[in-house]
């Protein structure tokens, strides 16, 4: 543990200010002028948090219900379409027996590569 990390230095800052004759509150008030802003009461803060949770749950519920509706609609149409394709077409080509004329020219060209 050779050198102190920056987070440890921040922990020692109030101690250094107190030893130097300044309390952390005095140092802050001298550096930054007092703000005349309105403070947020705990009730308002709790209302914001609860409202956020309710809206998040409503959005999740809406996405879930829409996802179920879309997958149901596509699932039935897709299933009948797949059955229709399976009845009309085969994805595999039938074997057509041996055709020696396809490979007959390979034997004639082989002598050039020797």
From Swiss-Prot:
Residues 81-109 form the ITAM domain. The keyword Calcium applies. It comes from Mus musculus. It is found in: Cell membrane. GO terms for molecular function: metal ion binding; protein homodimerization activity; protein-macromolecule adaptor activity; signaling receptor binding. One of its GO terms (cellular component) is cell surface. Residues 74-107 are annotated as: Disordered. Keywords: Calcium, Cell membrane, Disulfide bond, Immunity, Membrane, Metal-binding, Phosphoprotein, Signal, Transmembrane, Transmembrane helix. This is TYRO protein tyrosine kinase-binding protein. The record marks 56 as: Important for interaction with transmembrane receptors. The modification Phosphotyrosine is found at residues 92, 103. The keyword Lyase does not apply. Adapter protein which non-covalently associates with activating receptors found on the surface of a variety of immune cells to mediate signaling and cell activation following ligand binding by the receptors. TYROBP is tyrosine-phosphorylated in the ITAM domain following ligand binding by the associated receptors which leads to activation of additional tyrosine kinases and subsequent cell activation. Also has an inhibitory role in some cells. Non-covalently associates with activating receptors of the CD300 family to mediate cell activation. Changing residue 103 to F: Abolishes phosphorylation and ability to regulate cytoskeletal organization. Tyrosine phosphorylated. Following ligand binding by associated receptors, tyrosine phosphorylated in the ITAM domain which leads to activation of additional tyrosine kinases and subsequent cell activation. It is a single-pass type I membrane protein. Expressed on microglia (at protein level). Expressed on oligodendrocytes (at protein level). Expressed on macrophages and osteoclasts. Expressed on dendritic cells in liver, spleen, kidney and lung with highest levels in liver dendritic cells. It comes from the Eukaryota. One of its GO terms (biological process) is positive regulation of macrophage fusion.
């Amino acid at each position: 543990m050779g050198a102190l990390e920056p987070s440890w230095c921040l922990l020692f800052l109030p101690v250094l200010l107190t030893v130097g004759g300044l309390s952390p509150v005095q140092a802050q008030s001298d550096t930054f002028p007092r703000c005349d802003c309105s403070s947020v009461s705990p009730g308002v803060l709790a209302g914001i948090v609860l409202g956020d949770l309710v809206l998040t749950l409503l959005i999740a519920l809406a996405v879930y219900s829409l996802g179920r509706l879309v997958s149901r609609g596509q699932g039935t149409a897709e299933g009948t379409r797949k059955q229709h394709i399976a009845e009309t077409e085969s994805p595999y080509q039938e074997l057509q027996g041996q055709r020696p004329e396809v490979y007959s020219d390979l034997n004639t060209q082989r002598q050039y590569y020797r």
